[in-house]
């Protein structure tokens, strides 16, 4: 993607109807988007969710783009794989890049349960254990039966996860850290959020597992080829292994015949925290300028706004070459939880 004055358009919002027609609607407006100067489209997570109405952040199967009968539907909320490929073809013809929202932190909608030993973790401090070890029945088996091994034969089990949020035996919701096999949180994640940001929600992936690493790297290279992608948005980048996200970007880029664009979602108003993350990442990684968004929000609330300080302590000021500016997205809508 040509980064000179480029404009990435978020091609979805949170409350779009789950009518499986979104790819078709989006395809019809591609010429208009191109004509007004849009460079690339940020697509929602197009992978199969845990239910037909899921937006894809509740991800079930990376390799099912609306092709297989799984979790109550063949298509995703957004549409079928055939419609997505038609959208990608038209976008390429018009010179529009596609940025894919990659949800690599967690999984949802397991196909079966496994009994694992856990400890409960404090909701506000992930370093604090609040129970003795005990067994839970967790939905950690992901067999992807509708896909029948197409594209990948990988199946997930407890070894690919280090935490879950539901014990089916007691019908209890909590943060359960798996301790079988000596498991622990990833240590190369953000430490300013809850003491350790590894756990966010659902079934948390454990990137110390080599099989998991290899499969997710393979998926990244596969989907670039499958859709002719221009790049990726990395969802919740501070919540999973920094080492792995670096390796993943490097691997996917090495398998592509063109430069790819990478932008990470790291919600923090601390610009020093963002620049430190960038310092330990591949040079091509960008981050959303959350500090600028917070400045804009505070200015909009103020009775005496001072626009002369709007760029103070922002990423576009500190690292303009790595900043992606924004004024809102699906996380800042009225129907979602947001600090803005």
What is the predicted role of each segment?
Residues 10-14, 45-46, 327-329:
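Short loop/turn segments at strand-loop or loop-helix junctions that form parts
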Residues 1-20, 197-209:
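Boundary/entry segment of secreted carbohydrate-active catalytic domains
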Residues 19, 23, 77-84, 209, ...:
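Solvent-exposed, acidic/flexible segments
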Residues 150-211, 225:
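Long, low-complexity, polar/charged, intrinsically disordered or flexibly structured peripheral segments
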Residues 2-6, 25-32, 52-59, 66, ...:
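Active-site-proximal helices and loops of the catalytic beta/alpha 8
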Residues 34-80, 96:
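Aromatic-lined carbohydrate-binding/catalytic grooves of carbohydrate-active enzymes
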Residues 23-26, 38:
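N-terminal anchoring/stem segment of glycosyltransferases
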């Amino acid at each position: 993607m040509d980064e000179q004055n480029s404009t990435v358009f978020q091609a979805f919002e949170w409350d779009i109807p789950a009518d499986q027609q979104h790819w078709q609607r989006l395809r019809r407006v591609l010429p208009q988007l191109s004509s007004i100067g849009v460079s690339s489209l940020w697509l929602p997570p197009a992978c199969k969710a845990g239910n037909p109405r899921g937006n894809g952040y509740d991800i079930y199967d990376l390799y099912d783009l609306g092709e297989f009968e799984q979790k109550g539907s063949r298509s995703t909320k957004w549409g079928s794989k055939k419609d997505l490929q038609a959208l990608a073809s038209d976008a390429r013809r018009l010179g529009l890049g596609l940025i894919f929202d990659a949800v690599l932190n967690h999984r949802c909608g397991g196909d079966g349960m496994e009994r694992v030993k856990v400890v409960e973790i404090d909701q506000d401090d992930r370093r604090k254990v609040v129970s003795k070890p005990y067994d839970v029945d967790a939905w950690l088996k992901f067999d992807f039966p509708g896909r029948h091994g197409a594209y990948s034969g990988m199946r997930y089990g407890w070894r690919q996860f280090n935490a879950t949020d539901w014990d089916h035996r007691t019908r209890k919701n909590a943060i359960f850290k798996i301790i079988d096999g000596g498991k622990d949180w990833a240590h190369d994640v953000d430490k300013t959020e809850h003491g350790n940001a590894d756990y966010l929600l659902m079934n948390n992936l454990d990137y110390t597992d080599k099989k998991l690493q290899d499969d997710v790297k393979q998926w990244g290279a596969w989907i670039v080829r499958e859709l002719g992608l221009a790049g990726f948005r990395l969802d919740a980048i501070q919540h999973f292994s920094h080492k792995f996200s670096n390796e993943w970007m490097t691997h996917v880029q090495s398998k592509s015949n063109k430069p790819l664009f990478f932008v990470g979602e790291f919600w923090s108003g601390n610009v020093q925290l963002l620049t430190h993350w960038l310092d330990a990442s591949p040079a091509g990684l960008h981050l959303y300028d959350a500090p600028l968004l917070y400045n804009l929000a505070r200015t909009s609330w103020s009775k005496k706004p001072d626009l002369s300080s709007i760029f103070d302590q922002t990423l576009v000021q500190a690292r303009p070459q790595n900043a992606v500016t924004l004024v809102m997205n699906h996380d800042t809508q009225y129907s979602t939880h947001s600090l803005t």
